[in-house]
Structure formats: C-alpha cells, structure tokens
C-alpha cells in the first residue's frame, strides 16, 4: 500500500506502507496510519485546510479519528464508496498507467521481494513524474465534483 497527499499548492512524496505482520490479515493498521499522520500532517496542513482520505476502515478507526482530533485536523465527511469525490483516485489510475509504461515487466511479475522492491521504485518514479498542472487541475475540480454528485442524486458522474 502507498500513501500520498496533494492539494492545489502542495504534494507529498509517495510513502510505501508495509503491513503489520502481527495484524489479523497482515495489512496496514490504524497504528501505522497514526504514525504516518503524526509525522506528516502537522507540517502539511495549513489553518483552514480540509483533509480528505478514503473511508477505508483503517482511516476511520477510532484511534485514527482520535489522532486527527488531537492534531486539530478538519476531515471532509463524505459517503463511502464515492471515488467521484476523491481526486486522488484519478492520480492512482494515472500512476498505474505510468508504472506499466515505465516498467512493463511488473504487469506479470511474481510476488517476490525483488518484484516488491521494483514496484516501490516504479511507483516513486511514476509519482515523481506527475506534472504540477495535473495536481492543480484535479484540485480545482472539487467544486464541480460536489455539484455533479448532488445533481446526480448521489449516482455516478463523469469523475
């Protein structure tokens, strides 16, 4: 799993997140997200910024919400399963395209340590190749995205 954040005037680096081998399914846990948020968010967000993350259980866990409250982070509330309202979903799609363009061998790579290391390198290369204009354009689409979802009564939109 990877984490990154962007806004109209900023973009973080891409952060690979290792799963917790002690967790039930070995995935990323709220503890990992808490450490990440405590490391990044205080310097990342300015007063008045609204933070948006998807509604994955790891992001909505009580401990994570408590950390966000402690940090004074205002979180955008939005319905689950609403990628139309989350512009980073568009970036993840661009990233996948770019990764396979730069490293086509990854499409059918076995699940090995070497493949994972190559995927991390490819993802960082792809993330670093994103043009600022794409990030600005996606940020600027938020008012239109919200309007489109309202007009579609919560159904699918072009986003």
Please identify what each model-predicted range represents.
Residues 21-22, 76, 105-109:
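Short interface patches used for recognition in eukaryotic signaling and trafficking proteins
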Residues 4, 33, 37, 54, ...:
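Mobile genetic element proteins and their domesticated derivatives, centered on retroelements
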Residues 1-47:
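Electropositive, glycine- and tryptophan-enriched low-complexity nucleic-acid-binding patches
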Residues 88-159:
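C-terminal anion-handling pockets and recognition modules
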Residues 61-71:
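Short, aromatic/basic amphipathic alpha-helical patches
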Residues 74-80:
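His/Asp/Glu-enriched short active-site or ligand-binding loop at hydrolase and phosphoryl-transfer sites
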Residues 27, 55-58, 110-114:
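Intrinsic disorder
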Residues 45-60, 82-86:
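Acidic/histidine-rich, metal-coordinating catalytic segments
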């Amino acid at each position: 799993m990877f984490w990154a954040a962007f806004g109209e005037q900023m973009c973080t680096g891409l952060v690979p997140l290792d799963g917790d081998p002690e967790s039930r399914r070995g995935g990323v846990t709220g503890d990992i997200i808490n450490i990440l948020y405590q490391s990044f968010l205080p310097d990342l967000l300015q007063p008045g910024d609204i933070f948006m993350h998807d509604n994955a259980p790891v992001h909505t866990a009580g401990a994570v919400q408590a950390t966000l409250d402690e940090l004074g982070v205002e979180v955008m509330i939005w319905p689950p399963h609403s990628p139309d309202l989350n512009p980073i979903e568009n970036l993840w799609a661009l990233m996948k395209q770019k990764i396979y363009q730069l490293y086509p061998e990854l499409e059918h790579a076995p699940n090995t340590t070497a493949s994972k290391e190559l995927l991390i390198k490819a993802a960082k290369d792809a993330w670093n190749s994103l043009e600022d204009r794409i990030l600005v354009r996606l940020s600027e689409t938020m008012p239109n995205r919200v309007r489109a979802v309202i007009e579609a009564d919560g159904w699918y939109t072009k986003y």
